[in-house]
Amino acid sequence: MKYRLILATTGCVLFITVMAGVSWVEAEPQDFSKVPVKGMVTMIDLGAKKRIPCKMMAPIMEKMEKVYRGKAAIVFIDVWENREQAGRFRISSIPTQIFFDPEGKEVYRHVGFMGEEAIVAQLKSMGVE
């Protein structure tokens, strides 16, 4: 199965920035090795397409993609379809959002629905305007 990759998440499909200026890229699941994106603040949202909180976050993530394109990578990983990623990122509940600095170091972790204001505030605290 192929996944859509982009700078931010929309809905609950995998989206990732591989490099500034790239909007859409097709990739296989092994490309999760590029997450977190080196050299860029990265937000990973781990959840499942069929979960209500993911569906609620979809329009927020669409907006985040537009606002932060080229400034931050916002990645969604469906852990029901990619169970190994749940272990890799040590999650015990979904949704979980993890923020990484440009060096790939985890800076902040949140469990549960995360609204737009909270996402914007966290990105801003990490220097992303």
What label would you give each PLM region?
Residues 1-27, 129:
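N-terminal targeting signals for export/organelle localization
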Residues 90-98:
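Structural micro-motif
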Residues 24-41:
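A short beta-strand-turn-helix
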Residues 101-129:
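Non-catalytic, surface beta->alpha helical segment in thiol-disulfide oxidoreductase systems
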Residues 55-67:
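Typically the conserved alpha-helix immediately C-terminal to a functionally engaged Cys/Sec
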Residues 46, 65, 70-83:
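Thiol-based oxidoreductase modules, predominantly thioredoxin-like and allied folds used
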Residues 39-42, 46-50, 93:
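Short pre-active-site segment immediately N-terminal to redox-active cysteine/selenocysteine motifs
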